[in-house]
Amino acid sequence: MAVFRSTLVLLLIIVCLTTYELHVHAADGAKVGEGVVKIDCGGRCKDRCSKSSRTKLCLRACNSCCSRCNCVPPGTSGNTHLCPCYASITTHGGRLKCP
């Protein structure tokens, strides 16, 4: 019984320390994304949608996806394997959103 209690107390201490560490790092929210460089979504999407028959619709969808993922696959179509986040966003109907 004593072994069970000591194990339980040790586990509780570990959980509390882990929770504390997560809260401390979350408080430094400004520092979390400092190393990430934002890409030029407008320029990348302009290139991506340059051959689209519905350019405005393509640009709107592309910019939305780029702002979420900070990534636009190269070329005018395809290459979505280079940007998995971009390739996984779907509409409410289950269709791929990003051009």
UniProtKB/Swiss-Prot annotation:
Compartments, record wording: Secreted
Protein's job: Gibberellin-regulated protein that may function in hormonal controlled steps of development such as seed germination, flowering and seed maturation.
InterPro entries linked: GASA
PTM text: Six disulfide bonds may be present.
Gene that encodes the chain: GASA2
Family, similarity comment: Belongs to the GASA family.
Transmembrane regions: none
Any one of the GO CC terms: extracellular region
Main location (coarse class): secreted
Signal sequence annotation: 1-26
Source species of the chain: Arabidopsis thaliana
Protein name: Gibberellin-regulated protein 2
Keywords: Disulfide bond, Gibberellin signaling pathway, Secreted, Signal
Tissue specificity of this protein: Dry seeds and maturating siliques.
One GO process term, biological-process aspect: gibberellic acid mediated signaling pathway
